[in-house]
Amino acid sequence: MMPVSADKIFGWLSACLSIFIFIVSIKVSISSFRVKGKYKTIPFYMRIENILNYFVCSSWLIYSYIFNNIHLFSCSLIGTIFFFLWIIFIYLIYFRKISCFKYLTFIILALIYIPFILFLFGFSWSIGGPICVTFNIISFFPSILMLKEVIITKNYRLIKIKLNLLKLLAHLCWFIYGFIIININIVIPNVIGFIITFVSASFWNIFKKKSGSEKLSNRSVEVMRNRTEYTI
């Protein structure tokens, strides 16, 4: 029996984690877009998150196809299909409600046009890698906007901690995989993603503790007040 190499272990582990993250991300997006059957105002960073994810997956899909990387190709293919269907169907319903057909038309054209151009001109090692890295780094923009809102509002519930921890683990696995196969294009975005995700998890922990201590303090004050009233 042939021993399984480390790059295959971390490659498939990273791919499986990424696919699971795609599913959880879409589930979170659906719950955010719909509350008891009614549409609500969606923050800008949540509107563009899955669009950026689509561009990331489609660019990595072409890159992995050209360079014959089965681990990247499998998760990128599933991610591209998931986010494409999400944008076409869910955004179609949402933008119909707010009458933004021009915006929707732009999104649909971008979904078809950008991957076509990337495939038409083809990838080379010097061009394809930086394009994927650029899309990947841009996709962290919604996370930074969300983190900014968390810091301003001190509302730790904006951070989905389970999804955050999954992303943290996935970034770590992809980093190790990229390090093993010596691919800087995989290493760079996952180092940046790991840092942003770790900072988000840290703020979630900090603000949750502060919220818990404030609730405990308010409860103590209320108990003391009730005791004083009872004594009087």
Regions found by a protein language model. Name each.
Residues 1-232:
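Alpha-helical membrane-protein topology signature
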